[in-house]
Amino acid sequence: MDAYQQYIHKSRYARYLPSEERRETWKETITRYIKYWGDQLNDDERVEIFKAIHDLEVMPSMRALMTAGEALDRDNMAGFNCSYIAIDSPRSFDEMMYVLMCGTGVGYSVEEQYISKLPEIAEEFHATDTVIHVPDSKIGWAKSYRELVSLLYSGQIPEWDTSRVRPAGASLKTFGGRASGPEPLVDLFKFTVRLFKGAAGRKLTPLECHDLCCKIAQIVVVGGVRRSALISLSDLSDDALRQAKHGAWYNTESQRGLANNSACYTSKPSFEQFLDEWRSLYESKSGERGIFSRAASQKQAERNGRRDSDRDFGTNPCSEIILRKSQVCNLSEVVVRPEDTAESLRR
């Protein structure tokens, strides 16, 4: 490994060994990963895969390489790179929070066909004696947020108790990294209350859903470093999303910086529609919105012949994987070098 590769390994994938007060070596990281799969591999496969990873000929799921062990046992989602969800239920928001806290990227859609399924919000709000007690865990944060959203839909504004959440900077011994403390979660709770109160008596708009998703991603940090990955799909005709990153949005709606935005084309647009979208992209000075063609993804699925091509596909944040609603994906790599042959790459 060169110096840069060593840095990436030590800072991203090497687990800390408390008993030895150091991080894993590259060999120890691979050993932990191979050992995790137990009897799913025979002895010959273990030897071959270990050598291939060690010599940088292949890379396995890097999410699993990081979390294999107790962390992956506790949160299976942590083994996946990315996912896709349609915002069509109040539960979509807390599910997204949990997935992001596991380090998995999220593609999501706020197209009208999905967000129209959300319920209407109460016409009036009032404070209640209900207290949401937030546990100190990923699933605990997500469940607490689900409770908040549920109460807000019925017009109830609860209190919350985050005293059990470990302070900022505390070591996350199982998952690795440092705790963010309760402050980001409290910020999200307050943001959510304001947003729901502003939508009293109606359904959330696509832009409001988008902002809520971005704010959820904004709180998912480890050691103060952002680690959420998002892509937001919206209707081609949605002018509010088209304008979401125009002007000085970063001063007033900074959470929007957490997501890449793309218009979802369900059929070939007219020349005028296409030109309008590109003009908007240029005028925004942010390079957004991008373009995601659902029609093209359906054609690709049909060409592959491995799944139902009539589904309304979405995508992962990098937009290279076609995904169904609630589907996850993973990435692995074969490193091609000049001395490789077709036979060596196929082994």
What are these regions (language model features)?
Residues 1-347:
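Extended catalytic cores of very large enzyme megasubunits
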